[in-house]
Regions:
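N-terminal low-complexity, Ser/Thr- and acidic-residue-enriched intrinsically disordered segments
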Residues: 1-72, 116-117, 132
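Phosphate/oxyanion-binding active-site loops and adjacent basic polyanion-contact surfaces
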Residues: 5, 37-41, 69, 73-79, ...
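Extended hydrophobic secondary-structure segments that form protein cores and membrane-embedded regions
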Residues: 27-31, 59-66, 98-104, 132-137, ...
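Glycine-rich, phosphate-binding/catalytic loops in enzymes
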Residues: 45-47, 78-79, 151-153
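Glycine-rich phosphate-binding loop and adjoining beta1-alpha1-beta2 segment
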Residues: 50-103
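A structured beta-alpha segment of the ubiquitous adenosine-cofactor-binding alpha/beta core
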Residues: 82-130, 151-156
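Beta-strand-loop-alpha-helix segment that lines the small-molecule cofactor/substrate pocket
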Residues: 133, 151-179
Length: 179
């Protein structure tokens, strides 16, 4: 049996550990219409959701160049879920209420302004403080455009003391290079 995906905090001298509940946040996946999201990311997030390992308040925003509506995107992802006989329709519906989609050109500053507005709306709707985890499931040649775009509209900037609890994180999935 594999280890639980929970986050643990261990005291260095007492060796006692306790599980931490992740902070409420928005997970923004660039390259969301791709194979990595369908085969790996979404099934992993689904399993975390089923095991109550995601924050109580969260959302997943898929971003990609593919021109899907949010409904079309959710439908395409639903086909990728690892479902078994214990899963009920209400649980699937509840999970997909946390998923939205935004299409656009990663090299366009207009896209990042739209993203900023979308995140503001989703943060308000899900009652979040503006914590964002940006996940780049994209080819390496798109990394610079995405990071520059996030920085240009203030989404990846270090936050000021006026919002001390707000954070942004960036995960780059793809290795750099061509081989």
């Amino acid at each position: 049996m594999s280890a639980s995906p929970a986050i643990f905090l261990c005291e260095p001298f007492t060796k006692s550990c306790g599980e931490l509940q992740p902070e409420p946040c928005g997970l923004i996946i660039f390259g969301a219409s791709g194979d990595l999201t369908r085969r790996k990311l979404l099934p992993a997030l689904w399993r975390l959701y089923q095991r109550r390992r995601l924050p109580a308040r969260f959302y997943i925003l898929g971003c990609a160049r593919s021109a899907y509506t949010p409904e079309e995107f959710r439908l395409s992802l639903q086909k990728a879920l690892p479902l078994d006989s214990t899963v009920n329709e209400a649980e699937i519906t509840a999970f997909f209420k946390h998923i939205d989609y935004l299409s656009g050109d990663y090299s366009s500053l207009v896209f990042y302004e739209e993203l900023k507005e979308k995140l503001k709306h989703l943060d308000e709707y899900h009652q979040l403080k503006g914590n964002h985890l940006f996940y780049l499931a994209t080819p390496p040649n798109l990394t610079e455009d995405i990071v520059s775009g996030l920085g240009s509209c203030g989404l990846a900037a270090q936050h000021t003391s006026s919002l001390p609890l707000r954070w942004s994180r960036l995960i780059v999935e793809k290795p750099f290079g061509t081989s």
